[in-house]
Each structure stands twice: as structure tokens, then as C-alpha cells.
A protein has these predicted regions:
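Alpha-helical residues within the helix-turn-helix
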Residues: 46, 63-64
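Conserved segment of winged-helix/HTH DNA-binding domains
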Residues: 76-103
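Short, Lys/Arg-enriched N-terminal segment that forms or immediately precedes the first helix
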Residues: 2-19
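N-terminal helix-turn-helix DNA-binding core of bacterial DNA-binding proteins
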Residues: 17-18, 25-50, 79-85
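Internal catalytic or translocation cores that form aromatic/hydrophobic pockets or channels
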Residues: 40, 54, 69, 87-91
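Beta-hairpin "wing" of winged helix-turn-helix
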Residues: 65-78
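Hydrophobic, well-ordered secondary-structure scaffolds
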Residues: 10-12, 31, 54
Length: 103
């Protein structure tokens, strides 16, 4: 089951990390690719026709933002890292409301 990230405008560091992750067209393409797939870095690189080093960097940024999860699994020669979408919904309250107790 995927998660929901709900932020307020006061969660500046987390919003900055997510905004950075979403600011790249390549990272948006990776998110679309991982929408229904769990892939390793070489599969992402091959499908998007980019160097593996670029794919690894983009996935790392997406992972640091909390949008993607990467887990090591046994592979043919050692282990490989599989990446998938961690979050299916993101919302940011720009004007959060507060409950004020009445006297």
C-alpha cells in the first residue's frame, strides 16, 4: 500500500526536497515509469535512454524526497536495487487552518 504525504506551508524543508525532486523533467519521467513498475536502475536507464549514472542520481534524489523507495534484493551476481513509487498522493496546505477552542 502506498502512502499519502500531507504537508503544510510550514514544512519548508520537506517541501523544498519534494519540489527539487519534481523540478526535473527526467525525474517526472522516472515517476511515470515507476507508476506501475518496480525496476532496477539499469532498466530505468534503458527505458529512458539515459546513462545509468544519471538514472542512479535521479532515483537517489527521488528517494531522498520520500517519493520513491529503493530496496536491495538478491540478483544474479550479488544484489540489485529495485525502485518503486512510495507515495500515491501529495498535498500541501498553503493556508492551514487551526482549531481554536471557544471559551
Amino acid at each position: 500500500m502506498k502512502n499519502t504525504i500531507h504537508l503544510s506551508i510550514y514544512d519548508t524543508e520537506q517541501i523544498s526536497n519534494i519540489a527539487k525532486a519534481l523540478s526535473s523533467e527526467q525525474r517526472l519521467k522516472i515517476l511515470k515509469l515507476l507508476d506501475d513498475n518496480v525496476l532496477n536502475i539499469s532498466e530505468v536507464a534503458a527505458r529512458l535512454k539515459m546513462p545509468m549514472s544519471s538514472a542512479a542520481l535521479h532515483i537517489k534524489i527521488l528517494e531522498e524526497s520520500g517519493l520513491v523507495i529503493t530496496q536491495p534484493v538478491p540478483g544474479i551476481r550479488g544484489s540489485q536495487k529495485l525502485s518503486g513509487i512510495k507515495v500515491d498522493h501529495l498535498s500541501i496546505d498553503l493556508k492551514p487552518s487551526y482549531n481554536v477552542d471557544s471559551p
